[in-house]
């Protein structure tokens, strides 16, 4: 993919491809947290198990409760047949296995694209499906997650459901947790969803240091842009929970009324606004009780499996795996691969957690910590980090202007003879997205139709572009594509 677009070409995104050493968060060298290996590893295992329980046990409630909440009153966590792959955990699984085999925690963009083309082709939806179609025409991360090119990217909930495992990689290091998580969630999102990534990754990292939900939430708030919408959402939910501590239904109604922002149901329940609110509410009303937290996540509804998985990860870290095992829940130690060809078919919950633990050890060491033995016991010495906003919100108009300036030469180069079909298709797509199609049509009337013909050789991309995208971004791109002369694929 020598001609594919990579972030190395663009200053706007270049930070995402740098090595971790360039981003070592500043920590006080005298301020360390020491945890026994037994405790740290138990919390990582608890976080993963909480994520799996939240994800899979809430699937019956996923996108089921919209205007009104659910009515679950009793629930016993269980995985009697073991866990299985689902997009709330298996995209992270693909990354973790690859990171184990890599010298860096921050996989390069073309490596990530290769992983998707090998393993992540089915059982993906919304922004992630759009990502996979953009990869077909040679667009690599993080541009696959640019709102200018991916109409789901400025609201999609994958900024949350692809971040939890990375929070487990950086215990007590919320800045590092957010940074690693952003590297991978930027494959599919930007903007407000990137604030959700930082919010929840930082909260998971902080859960290794305290069981106080309010302190964990404070760390999350310190990790997001002070002017982002999610800050107001979290502030509102906290206020409503304090006002109605015994009436979660009223809080749910207030969330629905204020943050159901669009007419389209899919846009709303797939958006970071309602999902962030529901997750925070579940944590506040659950107050550290694993079962109560997940019941609340189920009942708040919307994209419930996403919300329960995130809340379950946080409370799972607090409780630890040994505590969960003492509850006598039916849990079979299995992680069945039902969705990701080429990935291990013999994975268990234990081996999945082992992978996270191994990488977490590397992350701790890369940030100035160490694993040592004292009095016959193995201890992790972890540099404590203060939570901080790693990536503020950027002005979308400025981003679009920068992309247009930097991508235009590549678009023009595709007008030459002997250019590959993929390069021509990519040029047509980029021109449509960046508002350059009209000028190309006028200035190159003989070549522009050839670019469109090349793009029409990718019917799966046209399908998500012209038929499957919701919200203002989807409407904008559809209108631009049709105005440029793009034809809908034959049904």
What are the roles of these predicted feature ranges?
Residues 103-158, 166-169:
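Extracytoplasmic mature domains of secreted/periplasmic and thylakoid-lumen proteins
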Residues 59-95, 99, 106-128:
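Active-site-surrounding "flap" and adjacent substrate/cofactor-binding loops of secreted or lumenal enzymes
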Residues 8-21:
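Bacterial N-terminal signal peptides
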Residues 28-37, 86, 244-273, 319-491:
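Helix-termini ("caps") and immediately adjacent flexible loops/tails
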Residues 37-58:
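Mature N-terminal segment immediately following signal peptide/propeptide cleavage
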Residues 35, 40, 145-154, 165-173, ...:
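Accessory "access/gating" subregions that flank catalytic or transport cores
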Residues 22-26:
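Boundary at the C-terminal end of the N-terminal hydrophobic targeting segment
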Residues 53, 57, 64, 68-73, ...:
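Catalytic phosphate/nucleotide-handling subdomain of diverse soluble enzymes
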């Amino acid at each position: 993919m020598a001609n594919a677009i990579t972030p190395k070409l663009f200053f706007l995104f270049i930070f995402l491809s740098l090595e971790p050493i360039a981003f070592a968060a500043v920590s006080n060298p005298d301020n360390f947290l020491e945890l026994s290996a037994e405790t740290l590893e138990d919390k990582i295992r608890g976080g993963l198990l909480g994520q799996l329980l939240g994800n899979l046990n809430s699937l019956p409630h996923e996108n089921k409760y919209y205007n009104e909440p659910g009515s679950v009153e009793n629930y016993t966590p269980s995985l009697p047949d073991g866990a299985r792959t689902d997009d709330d955990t298996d995209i992270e699984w693909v990354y973790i296995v690859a990171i184990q085999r890599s010298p860096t925690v921050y996989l390069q963009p073309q490596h990530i694209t290769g992983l998707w083309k090998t393993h992540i082709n089915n059982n993906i939806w919304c922004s992630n499906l759009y990502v996979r179609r953009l990869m077909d025409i040679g667009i690599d991360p993080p541009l696959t997650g640019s709102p200018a090119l991916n109409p789901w990217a400025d609201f999609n909930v994958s900024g949350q459901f692809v971040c939890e495992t990375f929070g487990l990689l950086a215990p007590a290091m919320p800045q590092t947790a957010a940074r690693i998580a952003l590297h991978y969630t930027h494959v599919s999102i930007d903007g407000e969803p990137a604030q959700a990534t930082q919010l929840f990754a930082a909260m998971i990292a902080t859960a290794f240091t305290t069981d106080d939900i309010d302190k964990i939430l404070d760390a999350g708030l310190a990790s997001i842009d002070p002017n982002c919408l999610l800050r107001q959402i979290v502030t509102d939910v906290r206020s409503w929970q304090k006002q109605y501590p015994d009436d979660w239904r009223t809080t749910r109604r207030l969330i629905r009324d204020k943050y159901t922002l669009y007419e389209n149901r899919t846009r709303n329940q797939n958006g970071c606004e309602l999902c962030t609110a529901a997750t925070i509410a579940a944590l506040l009303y659950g107050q550290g009780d694993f079962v109560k937290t997940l019941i609340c996540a189920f009942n708040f509804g919307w994209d419930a499996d996403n919300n329960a998985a995130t809340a379950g990860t946080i409370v799972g870290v607090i409780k630890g795996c040994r505590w969960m095992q003492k509850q006598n829940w039916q849990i079979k130690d299995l992680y069945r691969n039902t969705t990701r060809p080429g990935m291990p078919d013999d994975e268990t919950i234990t081996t999945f957690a082992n992978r996270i633990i191994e990488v977490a050890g590397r992350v701790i060491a890369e940030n100035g910590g160490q694993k040592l033995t004292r009095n016959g016991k193995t201890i992790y010495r972890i540099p404590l980090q203060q939570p901080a906003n790693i990536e503020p919100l950027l002005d979308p108009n400025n981003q679009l202007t920068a992309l247009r300036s930097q991508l235009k030469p590549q678009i023009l180069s595709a007008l030459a003879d002997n250019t590959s079909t993929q390069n021509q298709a990519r040029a047509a797509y980029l021109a449509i997205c960046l508002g350059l199609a009209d000028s190309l049509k006028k200035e190159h009337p003989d070549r522009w139709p050839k670019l469109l013909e090349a793009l029409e050789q990718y019917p799966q991309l046209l399908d998500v572009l012209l038929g499957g995208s919701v919200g203002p971004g989807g409407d904008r791109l559809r209108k631009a594509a049709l105005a440029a002369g793009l034809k809908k694929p034959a049904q």
